[in-house]
Amino acid sequence: MGIVGNSEVRVDAFDKATGRTKYYEDLVPADALYVRIKHSTIAHGFVKSIDLSEAEKIKGVVKILTCFDVPDIPFPTAGHPWSMDPGHQDIADRYLLNRHVRYYGDDVCAVIAENEVAAMQAVRAIKVEYEELPFVLDAQEAMKDGAPQLHER
């Protein structure tokens, strides 16, 4: 008839109960590196300088990339980024790492480490100096003449 009221034998029950089932964490190669991102702590501005000295001392840190290390190659993030029709292409307004911070949480550095703990500790140890710029939090205010502009026209 149906499943309701009847015991159902799960095909994966034995493997799960005996520990043979492979989960995501079981599939990570032993030599895999971990990446964590340092996010901006301001809503709008420019990264003036980045102090990596303490972060680079952390055992297990392999490399730290900053917004000054990667090229400014813009890419779109949504919609039709690869459309051949210019009318359907989204604005290429994102960068891998950002010198011009446009929102709280924008990506400014990437830490590559041998383990997740080292990566997270290094992110916390990075010190970023910003030149803060004005911003608005209201859509109506953002449309007014003279409102702060996040993107170049």
Where are these regions (language model features)?
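Flexible, low-hydrophobicity surface segments
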Residues: M1-R153
